[in-house]
Amino acid sequence: MIKKYVALAALVTAVSFSAIAQVAQYALPNFTDADCEAKTINLKVKDQYRNLCTAAGINSTAINNYLGTIGGALQLTFPNAKQPDKKLYEQAEKPADITLIYRLKYTANLPLRKVINALTATGLFVYAEPNYIMQKCYTVNDASLGNQYYIGQLKADQAWDVWKGDTNMVIGITDSGVDTNHVDLKPNIKYNYNDPYNGIDDDGDGYIDNRRGWNIWANNDNVYDAQDSHGTFTTGISSAKTDNGIGVAGIGFKCKFLPVRLDDNVGNYIRAYDAVVYAADHGCKVINCSWGSRFPSNFGVDIINYAVINKDAVVIASAGNDNNQEPFYPASFQYVINVAGLNQSNQKSPTSSWGANIDIVAYGSGIYNTYNPNTYVTSGGTSAAAPMVSGAAALLRSYYPTWKALKVAEQLKVTADPAFYSVPQNLQYATKLGKGRLDVLKALTDTTSPSIAMLNKAAKDNNDRNFLPGDTLRLTGLFKNYIRPATNGVVTLTCTSPYATIINNTFSLGNLNQNDTISNTSNPFKVILANNTPVNTPLEFKFAITADGGYNVLEWMADTVNRNRMNIDVGNVVLTVPSNGSVGFTNPYATPGAGFSYKDYGSLFYTSGFMVGEAAGPKVMDNVYATPPNYDADWGQVNPVRRRAIDVT
């Protein structure tokens, strides 16, 4: 008797076609054309095809023939980038190789999804993604609250009695540009004296006359956008000239800033991640990102990892102004300090996002600061909160010049003040606004607390990755202490869901010195899923990390169990079978699911699905593209797809 596995997809059926067909089509829920730069795609070539890559393009007949049909042109996005030092791969935090990233622009009247599909099918690329347009995390003006109350609340003024920063410490302001003639900003610009205005690239960095920053979109030194004051506003918070008897005070005090303009000429934040690379490459050890998007991307992950791991820069980003728990990027990427906002009463700012991804809070309401042209205004948003942390990071980094970026980030988080959680209006956000409110003084002066982070988080079952009712999940991670020694460290797992029973909820870390790591792979946390777990149940796991001296910090892991899709994993081949008539991925934008993949080549297609046709009609039932970006939804789920063993004799 032979056992054979069969994937059963329960689909809506009926006697006549007219009874089943759902005529309505729907736009893709993940992004629209307005969310992306038109006819532009970010591509990363797989390392095994490095020999095909040149500064001018990719030496592939198939790729070049396709580019010819779509009027496409490739450009190496970061031509000055170098491959990471091999030693960086030996540490817990892995570097990013951005040397094989290209940007494709095409002229044909084709939707992004169709071009991405064709490129993905070649198997040459790690990823092919839209170039998402970022949004600034800014709220409207409120002229009745003009003051700098946050300086005292964050104890920045007391911190200045300890340390006032250093002019060699530079904050990269990746934003809409800066009013370089603003009386409160001009003195703190970091000038590149090695490249005077003479039409020559004197310093050989690939940029001509980049004396005071760079305009990434226009590829020139015009870093001022008279129509958009966002960058001028955020810059003043971190970097305004302090103790000069006029205007406002920047938290970074003596620390300088480098303006890196990322918008086009009509206000679209279209070269945001490119700006991060420029800042990192030009010596900025702190980089502020008061912008973001609800769309994650592999391109974004690469850039953040490059800045933090390869270039040792602290990256700070706004949590977003959507007043929800949805992740916002780059703030929610690993290694970024994710900053939410409070109002003057220490309540969560009405617009600030919140959630398990938040690291720290600062102030995002009633912020009085610099504005175009050479003036001041009161405004807010998490755009304002992020540069407060950036200014503090610059102070701290210059105070401890040998500290690495991640150590600085952990010190800022571990010294944050959690007292604001006691404000009644904040009780509903318990643990979801980070470790606490930025405390600049304590960040400079605390010499006792360790800081343990959980890296490489993973959830596994019986290796089919389906997480079904009755399964036992094994949750693992690598725990690293970034700062001072920790004694008697313990990790305790909790989950509030009634469908998760934890049978191994603690792991002993023992004693960890600075930079020590320990993994629980051999002794994982174990969680049993209830037999009555509903379909697509979200679970949120909370890891409380404690150590002697009152140290206590939270880490989170979230996943969806009993999904309405199934991974069929046989040898080197993985296929995801959803319950809605699609194949490979549940949704038309290649998520969620593994697609149809072989070894480490990634999915061999972008979208696929079952189709039934009636020649006499002619009519077709399917869940694939109609006229992009519209997508047919003719099939529906009766029961979730499941795997079962049957006897074949």
Residue spans of the language-model regions?
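Autoinhibitory N-terminal propeptides
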Residues: V12, S16-A92, L124-T139, K155-D157
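Terminal connector regions
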Residues: P524-D569
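Subtilisin-like serine protease catalytic core
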Residues: D157-Y269, P296, S332-Y335, S345-N346, ...
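Hydrolase catalytic cores
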Residues: T235-S238, L258-N265, K285-C289, D312-A313, ...
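Substrate-binding/specificity loop regions of serine endopeptidase catalytic domains
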Residues: C137-V140, W214, A218, V223, ...
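Extended, loop-rich substrate-binding clefts of extracytoplasmic carbohydrate-active enzymes
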Residues: V612-T649
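Protease zymogen maturation seam
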Residues: Q83-R103, K114-V170, S176-I189, F295
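Intrinsically disordered, low-complexity Pro/Gly/Ser/Thr-rich segments with frequent PxxP/GP/PP motifs
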Residues: T501-T533
